[in-house]
């Protein structure tokens, strides 16, 4: 299992992912789920994956093959709109799944992968897309300016409470970190290092990128402050009516 998310706010895009792969309790490994492609002044693409690692790697290999082939029919550099790039990735994923479909069915395994694509092409607005295993895709909406893939449920509540179009890029990044940390605490199949990338609208340059381990000072401080803050907020919640009555009763002799 994995967890990746992308947020779209007025000033830009935020991407975050864990780095754990899990093929059972006896085989847990670390693998980056985020790829960044940048042609300064022209376009920026960030791609994250969840699901079948074999399918994800095959799609990444096909992307790199087409980028290195001047005669390729399409590549990340060809699309005039980012949704055309999303269509291209969806087709690559579908082709890879179809190639191994019968063998996977016999072993009762799944070759499905989900992708999040985000970035910007010169002259166009920055966008994020969730590309499904079936090859179709959706974009983030005004009301829900984020996308998630993988183990999504534990990290969703904080996004719903905090993220809006007007959220600053830095606050969106902090929220993404908390969302990932909440998931890591609740699901053993999601784990650090955490990769974080931030892209500023219209910069058309390499996104800021950093990797945080369990021992990274910023991550350790964030975890502690968030946990302490939750405890303080919980302790300050309103009392039930019967607690108030009990508190007002005179102490017995």
Predicted segments with their positions:
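N-terminal nucleophile
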Residues: 1-253
């Amino acid at each position: 299992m994995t967890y990746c998310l992308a947020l779209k706010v007025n000033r830009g895009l935020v991407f975050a992912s864990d780095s754990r792969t899990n093929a059972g309790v006896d085989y847990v490994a670390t693998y980056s789920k985020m790829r960044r492609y940048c042609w300064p002044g022209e376009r920026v693409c960030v791609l994250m994956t969840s699901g079948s690692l074999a399918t994800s790697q095959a799609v990444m290999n096909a992307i790199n093959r087409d980028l290195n082939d001047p005669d390729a029919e399409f590549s990340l550099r060809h699309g005039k709109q980012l949704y055309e790039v999303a269509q291209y990735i969806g087709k690559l994923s579908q082709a890879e799944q179809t190639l191994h479909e019968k063998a996977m069915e016999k072993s009762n395994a799944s070759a499905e992968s989900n992708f999040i694509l985000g970035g910007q092409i010169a002259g166009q607005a920055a966008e994020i897309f969730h590309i499904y295993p079936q090859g179709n895709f959706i974009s983030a909406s005004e009301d829900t300016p984020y996308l998630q893939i993988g183990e999504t449920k534990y990290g969703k509540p904080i996004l719903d409470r905090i993220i809006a179009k007007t959220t600053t890029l830095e606050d969106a990044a902090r929220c993404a970190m908390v969302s990932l940390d909440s998931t890591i605490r609740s699901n053993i199949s999601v784990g650090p290092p955490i990769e974080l990338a931030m892209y500023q609208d219209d910069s058309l340059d390499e996104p800021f990128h950093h990797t945080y381990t369990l021992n990274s000072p910023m991550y350790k401080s964030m975890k502690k402050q968030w946990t302490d803050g939750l405890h303080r907020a919980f302790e300050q919640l309103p009392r039930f009516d019967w607690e108030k009555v009990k508190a007002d009763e005179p102490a017995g002799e």
